[in-house]
């Protein structure tokens, strides 16, 4: 039986008292959080789980790499964030004594978002100032262009095919993704869900 688990580790840089004022300080301490998270993953490793991670930032990337390597796990990692999110990304880790990976692909989902027609110079400037007004809450968000915003998101999806070492004919597809945090514009997230499902479905269909 294949066991797959996923965990959003919450990028260390984003776990601040300002964002989580009701949390105990120890719960926000990067060192304490890292220890707690790795302890949780130990239980999954004992079960030979395939582990999918989201919001893994640069500060912890090396720690997770060493953690998995010492336990004979291989980690596939993709970073897409900016300095504001510590260049966070997503990862898939699997036990090397149980599986091998093939046809691994890393896809920027926004590359598949249908492109809006190129604006004229006048409409470009209108859109530019319109977005500024929205940003500073000087205009209704009803005029927000979800399709254009969706095409700007850098979030990447990892897709890989794992095959059993004991029985190479047994193969399955694993993918992981972190949705853009556009909570005030849910249509952006809906667009990404649709494009994500299309990308994973296409990958699975084309996998041997």
Model-derived regions, located:
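Feature marks short, surface-exposed loop/turn motifs that line or immediately flank catalytic pockets
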Residues: 11-13, 180-183
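Structured beta-strand-rich core segments of catalytic domains in phosphoester-bond hydrolases
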Residues: 50-180
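N-terminal, active-site-proximal structural segment of metallo-dependent hydrolase catalytic domains
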Residues: 1-70, 80-90, 125, 131-133, ...
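Alpha-helix termini
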Residues: 43-47, 97, 163-168, 201-208
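Glycine-rich loops and low-complexity Gly/Arg-rich segments
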Residues: 28-33, 75-79, 101-102, 116-119, ...
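Surface-exposed beta-strand edges and their flanking turn/coil or helix-capping segments
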Residues: 18-19, 50, 116-119, 187-190
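A long, amphipathic alpha-helix that forms part
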Residues: 184-208
């Amino acid at each position: 039986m294949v066991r797959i688990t996923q965990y959003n580790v919450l990028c260390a840089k984003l776990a601040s008292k300002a964002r989580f004022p009701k949390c105990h300080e120890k719960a926000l301490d990067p060192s304490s959080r890292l220890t707690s998270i790795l302890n949780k993953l130990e239980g999954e490793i004992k079960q030979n789980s395939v582990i999918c991670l989201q919001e893994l930032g640069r500060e912890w990337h090396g720690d997770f790499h060493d953690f998995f390597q010492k336990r004979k796990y291989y980690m596939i990692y993709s970073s897409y964030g900016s300095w504001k999110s510590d260049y966070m990304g997503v990862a898939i880790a699997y036990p090397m004594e149980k599986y091998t990976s093939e046809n691994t692909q890393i896809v920027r989902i926004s590359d598949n978002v249908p492109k809006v027609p190129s604006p004229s110079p006048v409409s470009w400037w209108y859109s530019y100032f319109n977005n500024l007004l929205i940003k500073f809450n000087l205009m209704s968000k009803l005029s927000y262009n979800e399709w254009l915003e969706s095409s700007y998101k850098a979030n990447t999806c990892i897709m890989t095919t794992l095959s059993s070492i004991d029985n190479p004919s047994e193969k399955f597809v694993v993918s992981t993704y972190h949705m853009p945090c556009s909570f005030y514009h849910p249509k952006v997230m809906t667009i990404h869900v649709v494009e994500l499902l299309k990308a994973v479905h296409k990958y699975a269909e084309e996998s041997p």
